Amino acid sequence: MTVGTLSVVSSTASDTASHVSDTRKRQYQRDEALRKKIISELGKKSGNFESPVRKIRRNGEPGTVDSAALDPALTVHMQSLVTETAQLMAAKRQNCVLVVDDDEQLAGIVTATDIATRCVGAGLNARQTLIADIMSTSPLCITSDTRFDDALLLMIEHKFRHLPVVSDGGPDGSAGDEGDVIGIINMRACLREPLNRIARQQEAAQKLVEALEGAQEEIENKSVSGNTNSSSVSGNHAAEFLEYVESLKKKASGLEIMSLIDSSEEPFLVGTRTTVAEATESMARSGVSAVLVMDNGAVSGVFTAHDVVLRVLAAGLDPYRSSVIRVMTPHPDCALASLRVSTALERMIEGKFSNLPVVDESDAIIGMLSLFHLATAIEQTPEEEEEVFDQAENDAGIEPSNGFEDQQQQLLGNSNEVVENYDVNPPLPLNPLPSNTQQSESTYEYSARQLPKPPVQAWQNENLSSNNKPQEYVGVENDYNFSNNPPTAMSEQSFHPSVSQKPMDTPENGSNSFAASPYLQPYNSASQLAPSYVGSLPQYHGNPSFVEQALQDLVQPTDSASQIFPLNPQSPSQFTIKYRSIAGRVHRLRLDGINSVSDLRTAVEEREKEQLVTLTYIDDEGDVVELVSDSDLREAILLARRRGLPRLEVRGVAAFTNHLESSHPPISTVDSSIGSASVVEKGVANSIVDIHQPTAKADKGNSKKPIYIGIVSSSIVILAVSMWYLRRKR
């Protein structure tokens, strides 16, 4: 999945500026023309319709809701139609209205998401549905003296972005009657205060890091040279000091949005020809307010609930006949995975959008974040971290001209208490590999402590002494999984349990754990060790032939075992199969529930009710490959792993066997390089993809005969009537 013409948001100031393409400018002009038309129509109906109301600004206490610019409290009656409400929201540039009853009392609240999911997504007719049928009753309100943090926590807890604000009366009654609604506050207004606080904290941490860099280098040099004595900082205090500096560096850099991406939740995708009704139905079913629109494998735009209100219902379009490409927002702004959360929030507040697609370095879509994700991230900062930042502001005033010993004592004296708030145990550095390759007691030795060696099981001794593959595999799950990430530096957690964990389980207590470090030597061959080792892992249990065949194709005889095993295998839930149906709908299937092609076909038939479907995928050479046997599926997964893809994309093609047998010869295939998959040649690939074309031609040829017969019959009838008329006239 690649990105089309999108503007990518990075962490630099120049890239943060919004780059609006010509297409989006034209879309903005059309929206403004539509609003003017709606205002004109509403003015003719009501006679005194006003232009969009500006935000309400009040001189309240700083840090409270009363000091923010509130949205106007638009009200509609319970008996109003959804289309009328959508036109009012579009004309007033609002995404939320309050619903009142006959007594002018607050009865509910309706947002753009409610209209999109509860009305259009539920299959209701917006021209006949009352606003009372889709509103949220008994809305939660806050008073004007509520602080921003409390309002934001309330929004995150209940998962909504708008809160009605009522007056607290004030000491002299100047703020209005107590209980009167004075406006509506949205989540963006509540996020400005936390963003300013995070900016101040990161600035203070950065200043302290700059002040401590010199002391850190001198401590590290003394630790390496062994000159640390009792007159200076002790070894334990030096380690705490270095840990404190590293934690400050992380806090100064900020949290990346990649840490918020859940690999099990992917953005919902629709095609350009998907109707608005189908897209909103998918939004309601998945509980999201936006979907990405794909065109030929690239992101063409984003379709949100705001688009449903403004460009569909307010414009008078039919959701069942309008496609999303007509009303979507083209070329949405995207963010790199390395972007800081605070920077992403600032960009969303500046651009006034609530959904942000996330891309990697290769411009591939890896997820989509909403305001809820980012707001939750900044509000989950523990109080301990805030204490660290407060301490950093005080410590940043230390003069660098002090002596090294005095500076260390002063810094450590101020930071020892805050260091206790952290439960961080970084991996200890590794010593270089020993020169003797025959050493078998400890291939990797840690400088701080000697960790216990795991027990050697019987099957491991047998595998190390023989090149024959074992006949029995031990494990608990039935799945194929192997990481294709580049080799990384080995850490303590790669081979041994941490100090806080229990020692390695033994065969007596029923565990089959395996530690690689004492048994993998630089001279070992990965092709000899990999099948037996990986077959013993829990995630490969129950299907030895599947794992063995895949690893024989993946691991070459010249590969080194020390290069293969440091790879961190992904969990079974991280690799998925995405099926795109004939109609363009996308389904996400879990790999641990699919063990063969028949299981995949069964899953497809359950979701799409398509009996005659040919399953295909695109290989690394761009060929259309048909999935016929289990070996084809195994090879497809293996190719996706080699290419570093987290998923396998499978497409369904209609199999019209009657037309194919009568009008086309059998499809010619060539053998694949691995296994026995059938690769459709490019010459006939188009006939499979556009399989409706020969059917249409055949139907068109057959339809010519009835047309010809009808024309001849009509001519004969007209001629007979003319002759009868002429005879009678004579």
From Swiss-Prot:
Biased composition (Polar residues): 458-470, 480-515
One GO BP annotation of this record: meiotic cell cycle
Cell compartment(s), UniProt: Cytoplasm; Nucleus membrane
Cellular component GO terms, alphabetical: cytoplasm; cytosol; nuclear membrane; nucleus
Alphabetized UniProt keyword annotations: Cytoplasm, Meiosis, Membrane, Nucleus, Repeat, Transmembrane, Transmembrane helix
Record's compositionally biased regions (Low complexity): 7-20
Main location: cytoplasm
Protein name per its UniProtKB record: Meiotically up-regulated gene 70 protein
Native source organism of the sequence: Schizosaccharomyces pombe (strain 972 / ATCC 24843)
